[in-house]
């Protein structure tokens, strides 16, 4: 009830204040409010000067604990004139520093070479460890096998086989000679076709016999050249092509 009474005094005083085009109520506004509410204003001085009144002491002033400031870098920016003083201060100057989120690519030749060499060394080391763990290894020390493992050397089953196999150059030369011989055979087979049709009967018979003989010789040469075993083939000199 007391709270509602005080609230009504404040609301009425505020309305009288605004009615007179003011923003803050004065003592006269409160007196008019009390009179309108039916309160005798003349009894207030006698009530205030009574002997058995209760004196309310002011609350003790306590010093607010000072919060320690964090590490500051630089001097904070002061508030402009349009910002009230009870607003918090501006943050430290390092708050506004821009920090790029990407790194510039390294373009120094020496740094790139060192980085490539270290990556290559790491790859070789990782591959060596993988081969040592998955395959057969040899150790430098007889007592401790796990120290300094080396990849075991695997000898060839037939060590003399590499000396007997022809090299790539010899295979290429053999293919060139085979292709040149086939071209010569096709030229000799197509030779009787250029004989004119106006020849007499004996000439046609001789041409047919010559064609049969060349075909038989070509088939024999082809059979001789088609040898599966490369070690049994006859030695052929490479054909030297002259530049035109």
UniProtKB/Swiss-Prot annotation:
Motif (Nuclear localization signal): 231-244
Bias (Basic residues): 234-244
Keywords: Cytoplasm, Developmental protein, Differentiation, Nucleus, Transcription, Transcription regulation
Acidic residues composition-biased segments: 173-187
Residue runs in coiled coils: none
Compositional bias (Polar residues): 208-220
Gene3D superfamilies: Histone, subunit A
Purpose of the protein: The TFIID basal transcription factor complex plays a major role in the initiation of RNA polymerase II (Pol II)-dependent transcription. TFIID recognizes and binds promoters with or without a TATA box via its subunit TBP, a TATA-box-binding protein, and promotes assembly of the pre-initiation complex (PIC). The TFIID complex consists of TBP and TBP-associated factors (TAFs). Mediates both basal and activator-dependent transcription.
RNA-binding as UniProt keyword: no
Primary subcellular site in the record, as a coarse category: nucleus
Keyword Metal-binding: no
Protein name, as recorded: Transcription initiation factor TFIID subunit 8
Gene: TAF8
Example GO BP: transcription initiation at RNA polymerase II promoter
Organism: Gallus gallus (Chicken)
Source species, domain of life: Eukaryota
PANTHER family found in the cross-reference section: TRANSCRIPTION INITIATION FACTOR TFIID SUBUNIT 8
């Amino acid at each position: 009830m007391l709270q509602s009474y005080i609230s009504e005094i404040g609301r009425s005083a505020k309305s009288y204040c605004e009615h007179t085009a003011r923003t803050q109520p004065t003592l006269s506004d409160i007196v008019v409010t009390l009179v309108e509410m039916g309160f005798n204003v003349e009894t207030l001085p006698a009530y205030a000067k009574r002997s058995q009144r209760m004196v309310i002491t002011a609350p003790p002033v306590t010093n607010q604990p000072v919060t320690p400031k964090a590490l500051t870098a630089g001097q904070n920016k002061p508030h402009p004139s349009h910002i009230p003083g009870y607003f918090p201060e501006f943050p430290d100057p390092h708050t506004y520093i821009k920090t790029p989120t990407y790194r510039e690519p390294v373009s120094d030749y020496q740094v790139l070479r060192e980085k490539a060499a270290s990556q290559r060394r790491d790859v070789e080391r990782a591959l060596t460890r993988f081969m040592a763990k998955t395959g057969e290894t040899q150790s430098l020390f007889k007592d401790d096998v796990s120290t300094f493992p080396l990849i075991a050397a695997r000898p060839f089953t037939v060590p003399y086989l590499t000396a007997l196999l022809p090299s790539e150059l010899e295979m290429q030369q053999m293919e060139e000679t085979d292709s040149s011989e086939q071209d010569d055979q096709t030229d000799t087979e197509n030779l009787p076709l250029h004989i004119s049709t106006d020849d007499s009967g004996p000439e046609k018979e001789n041409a047919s016999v010559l064609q049969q003989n060349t075909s038989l010789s070509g088939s024999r040469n082809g059979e001789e050249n088609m040898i599966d075993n490369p070690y049994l083939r006859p030695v052929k000199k490479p054909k030297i092509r002259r530049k035109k």
